[in-house]
Amino acid sequence: MPHCIIEFSSSLDIPTDLLVEAVHHGVLESALFESSHIKTRALAYEYFRLAEDCNDFIHVTIRLHHGRTTQNKQQLTKLVLQHLKNLR
């Protein structure tokens, strides 16, 4: 049962529902979990500080139970990142 936590800058020019859908679909596409077991939530941060040349951020944490291989985790990460990149 993965718990996906998306943290992002509130100034990000991507609607929150699209961020949640992108991460959720990336996890689902991995075929490692049943759809009913995937939990995804998002938190927007109004106050944050980044490097001088950065204005926005997206940070995704996926919490998993034990038992997933390194290869499973790498594939999961790749799929989620691919779905997020498709938003731009």
Question: What is the predicted function of each stretch?
Answer:
Residues D13, D17, D53-D56:
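Acidic-enriched, low-complexity/disordered segments with a strong bias for Aspartate over Glutamate
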Residues P2, S36-R63:
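Short edge beta-strands and adjacent turn/loop segments
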Residues A51-R88:
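Mid-chain, well-packed structural core segment of small domains
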Residues T16, S35, T70-Q74:
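Alpha-helix N-cap/helix-initiation sites
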Residues M1-P2, R68:
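A contiguous, well-structured "functional interface" segment within a domain
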Residues A22-V27, L79-H83:
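Short, well-ordered amphipathic alpha-helical segments that serve as non-catalytic structural scaffolds
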Residues H3-S9, D17-H24, S30-I38, A42-Y45:
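N-terminal, polar/charged subdomain of small-to-medium soluble alpha/beta proteins
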Residues S11-D13, G67:
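Short, surface-exposed acidic/glycine-rich loop or hinge patches that mediate macromolecular interfaces
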